[in-house]
Structure formats: C-alpha cells, structure tokens
C-alpha cells in the first residue's frame, strides 16, 4: 500500500502477505533448513526411521529421504523447493536423496552467516557456482574406474545402498538379486551399456520372510487363469500376446438387427459362435499354448480355449504386456487375424501358483530375458514396502555404475576430500568470493559430521580425527560408524557411484542458489473455502519459528 496526497493506494489484494529483503531471505532459509533437519537423522547406516501417518490413518515407516518428503504435506514454497531437490536426485541418480537435501540445508545455513556479515547474495551465489563447478571436476578426478563385469564392486555398491534400511539383515542376498536383475536387462548401445530399470518389475506380496524374495527370469503377473477347465501349468510355452479383445465387437454405428423368427435368432447366435471359434482356431493354428489378452475374453472363447488345452489370461496391463514381449521375445498383435508363428514368444514354464493365498501367473525360464521380475516377500506390509525401496535404490546404484563405470568412496570420504580441495581452490580465487567458496567447503563437512552424530559418536572429535587421517593416509579415508574410527572406505566396501555424489552437489547448490536469489515473497490471501477447511487444523502460515540455531 502506498500513500499519495493522503489517499491510500491498494496495489495488492487485501490479505496479501509480503516479505521483503532480509525478512524474505531469512524466512526462506529457515523453511529450507527445517526440511533438511527433518531428514538429517535418517542419514547413514545408523540413521533412524520416520513414521508418517496420513489423514486416512495410513502409516509409512521409512528412512528414505525421497519417500519421507513425498509423503509430507508441505505448504511453504521454499520448503517445496527442497522436496524438488530430493525428487530430482531420485530421478537422476536413484540414491543420495537425503545427502542432497542435507547439503542444501547446510549451504543455506552458511549463506545466512555470510549475509549477516553484509556480504551481498550475488557474491555468495557466484562463489557457490564456482565451488559447485570445481566440485564436479574434483569428483571426476578422484573417481575410480570399474569394469562392468566386476561383480564384487557392483555387489558392494548395492549393499551400501541397502545398508540402513529395514532390510539390512538380508542386504547381501538382496544386493545379489539387484545386481543379477540389472545385468540381465542391460543392453549395449553404441558401445555403452544402457539399463532401462522399467524392465525390472518389483511385485510385492505380504507373507513369508524377506529371504523368500526371489528373482524370476521372466514376468510375474497378478492375475489368474480365466477358466477352471484350462491347464494351470504349461511347459515349453509358446506365448501369444494380443492387445485386443477375444470378443465379438460391437459396431460403432447405432445399427439395429431385426429378428422376426426363431431361425433368424439361431442363425445370429451361430454366426457369433463361428466368429469366436475362428479366433480361437487361429490361436491354435499358429501353435500357441498360452495367450495373454489385454482386454476381455468372451465366455464361449474361454470354453474353446480350455477345450484346446490353451492357458489364457485376460485384462493384462499394457506395461505387463510390454514386459512379457521383452522377456519372451513375443510380438504384441493388435488384430488376431495377423497372428503368425513368428509372433509367438517362448518360455520354459508358464504356471499359475498361489502366493500368500492369491493366484499369480509365473512366466519363467525365458532364454534371454530383457525384462525380469523380483517377487518381494516380507512379514508385514511395512517390511515389504521398505524392502521395495531398498531394492529400488540398489538397482539404480548398479545401473549408475554400469552406465558410467566410475565409483568413489562413501562414508563421508569424498565430502572430506572435496572440502580440503575447495579450501585450497578458494585461496586461488581470492576476493569476497573466497569466503563463499570456503563456506561451501565447510558445508560439505555436514555429511561426515551427521554420520558420526547418527551413530552416537562425538561429531567434533570424530571429524577432527577423520580429517587428520584423511590428510595423512589418502582420499578414501572416511568414518567407520560401526567402529567409530577412521577407515579406508574402499577396503570396507563402502562404495557409491560418482553420479550419485555429483548430482547431489549439483542439485543442492542449485536449490541453495535459487533460494538465495529471492528477496521478495508475495503470498496471495487464501480462498475462503481453504480458510474454513483450516479452522482448528493448526495450519502454519509462511512465517514460522524453529529451534534451529
């Protein structure tokens, strides 16, 4: 609101909130740091879990950063940016979501200290940009190259990703499944390995133990055989995939058929039966003994299929049809008349089995499957969900290493190395930007410090010890949280893909820079309906307080 000759001028609607300059920066930094603090205690093998209960009473128990932030109903716009950091990290690298968010929060904390010293945001932004670019170069220089057939390294990296999750007791077993699954679906393109993780299906079923989780060289479908008279088990299966219905189609035009005698009705029904029999005869003629249909199967068609000893499954999801095609080598056919023996896929066995009291179709023993399934088992829904998240992380980590062929040491070793190298680089740059680069270097120490804190160690004492050992013994020295002492992370098998770390630093610095650029927040007033819904709900406005120092 401005005032001219005593007349108030309303520029923004009534009820609009506005924060300018340092107030806006302080508020945004606080919101982002609260998010970072929320996930910080989950970091590392000794990290704690979060229990999230939604408005319907559904419970999620996890220590996966991306899942925690995705499940939380976050209102503040700056806090939402931190959620985007986690989502980007998850999409691009598959692991390191908590690391990225914690680093972003610490970068903002250090930036606030510089702002309090009257250093302009533009200078901090320039320093952070230089530091982020230099960090990418340093990570490339310290990364160790690995061959795709180095099973031991892939296994250790997968185990590192699973460590700290609920499935930790079976981490070696699950890591083996993840490595085998990724290697089966990996394809060579232009001399490089490429992995489409959509070709690895994770199917969950409660019951049994985590150890009962298994890899199927093929596809598992949560469906059952359509007719009780059909065989439940077919060996040396010849598989047809049809994305149309095995039914007589209705015409799109509003046509009417006038039947004036019982003979005409009989002829009509016989013609319908003949059409359905021709469809089934075509399937039998090409040599198929298993058929998966994306749409429905008429009762009469089911009868003929059962009569010919053909196993049929209907209403199969499009994504499952595509996986079946990749696993068995079959081609998906739209028109049944076009079906040929060349369109059929092969599998050693197609069988309907009971899993946790429900029927499922197993298509296994495929010769060179480019789609596989991991059937996840566990005692409760929460265990099964957490095993799924652990496997997702492990699969993505193995994918990163196969595609990039580069690894670095975990356990805070790479962050300490970056911190030391960036301190040296800051002196070369000089000027006020030097302060920002030094702040960036200091912020990276939050990872080893947090690992120590979450393990119940003295963070300052541990950090001093580790940095001294790191400078003396080399760049792979990090924190062994089990022993509470500095150790060679490569020797201990704590390995991460370089892509995870590069993306974490890139995402964190970009988010911090974006938040630092904001010097004005204009928030429109909420709609009346929203206000009514919030009464008594304790919903916080943008302004908030926290016990963060």
Curated annotation (Swiss-Prot):
Is the Chaperone keyword given for this protein?
A: yes
Query: Where does this protein have compositionally biased stretches of type Basic and acidic residues?
Result: 528-538
- Biased composition (Low complexity) is annotated at 540-549
Q: Which Gene3D superfamilies match?
A: GroEL, GroEL-like equatorial domain, TCP-1-like chaperonin intermediate domain
Q: Name one Pfam family in it.
A: Cpn60_TCP1
Q: According to the UniProt record, where is the region Disordered? A: 528-549
Quaternary structure, per UniProt, is: Forms an oligomeric complex of eight-membered rings.
Q: Which NCBIfam families match?
A: thermosome_alpha, thermosome_arch, thermosome_beta
Name of protein: Thermosome subunit
């Amino acid at each position: 609101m401005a005032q001219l000759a005593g007349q108030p001028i309303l520029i923004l609607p009534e009820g609009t909130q506005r924060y300018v300059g340092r107030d806006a920066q302080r508020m945004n930094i606080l919101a982002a740091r609260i998010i970072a603090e929320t996930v910080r205690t989950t970091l590392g093998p000794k990290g704690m879990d979060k229990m999230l209960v939604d408005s319907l009473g559904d419970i999620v128990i996890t220590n996966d950063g991306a899942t925690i932030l995705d499940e939380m109903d976050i209102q503040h716009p700056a806090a939402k940016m931190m959620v985007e950091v986690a989502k980007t990290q998850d999409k691009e690298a598959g692991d390191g979501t908590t690391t990225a968010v914690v680093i972003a929060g610490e970068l903002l904390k250090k930036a606030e200290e510089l702002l309090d010293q009257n250093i302009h945001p533009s200078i901090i932004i320039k320093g952070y940009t230089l530091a982020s670019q230099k960090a990418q170069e340093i990570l490339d220089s310290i990364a160790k190259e690995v061959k795709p057939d180095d099973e031991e390294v892939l296994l250790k990296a997968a185990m590192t990703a699973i460590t700290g999750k609920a499935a930790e007791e079976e981490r070696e077993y699950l890591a083996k499944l993840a490595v085998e699954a990724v290697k089966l679906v990996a394809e060579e393109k232009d001399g490089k390995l490429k992995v489409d993780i959509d070709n690895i299906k994770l199917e969950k079923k409660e019951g049994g133990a985590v150890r009962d989780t298994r890899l199927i060289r093929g596809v598992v479908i949560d469906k059952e055989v359509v007719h009780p008279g059909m065989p439940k088990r077919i060996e040396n299966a010849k598989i047809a995939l049809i994305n149309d219905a095995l039914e007589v189609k209705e015409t799109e035009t509003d046509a009417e058929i006038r039947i004036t005698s019982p003979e005409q009705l009989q002829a009509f029904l016989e013609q319908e039966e003949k059409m359905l029999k021709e469809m089934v005869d075509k399937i039998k003629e090409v040599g198929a003994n298993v058929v998966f249909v994306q749409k429905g199967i008429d009762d009469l068609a089911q009868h003929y299929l059962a009569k010919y000893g053909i196993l049929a499954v209907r209403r199969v999801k499009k994504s499952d049809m595509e996986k079946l095609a990749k696993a068995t080598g079959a081609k998906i056919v739209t028109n049944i008349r076009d079906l040929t023996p060349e369109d059929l896929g092969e599998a050693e066995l197609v069988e309907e089995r009971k899993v946790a009291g429900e029927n499922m179709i197993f298509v296994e023993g495929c010769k060179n499957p480019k789609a596989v399934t991991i059937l996840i088992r566990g005692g409760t829904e929460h265990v099964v969900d957490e095993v799924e998240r652990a496997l997702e992380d492990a699969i993505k980590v193995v994918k990163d290493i196969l595609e990039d062929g580069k690894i670095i040491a975990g356990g805070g070793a790479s962050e300490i190395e970056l911190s030391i190298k960036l301190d040296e680089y800051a002196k070369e740059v000089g000027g006020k930007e030097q302060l920002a680069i030094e702040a960036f270097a200091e912020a990276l120490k939050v990872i080893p410090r947090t690992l120590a804190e979450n393990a119940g160690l003295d963070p300052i004492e541990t950090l001093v010890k580790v940095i001294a050992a790191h400078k003396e013994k080399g760049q792979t020295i990090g924190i062994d949280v089990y022993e509470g002492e500095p150790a060679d992370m490569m020797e201990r098998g704590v390995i991460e893909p370089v892509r995870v770390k590069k993306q974490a630093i890139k995402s964190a610095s970009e988010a911090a820079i974006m938040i630092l650029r904001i010097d004005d927040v204009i928030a429109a007033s909420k709609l009346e309906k929203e206000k009514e819904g919030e009464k008594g709900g304790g919903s916080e406005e943008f302004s908030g307080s926290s016990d963060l120092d």
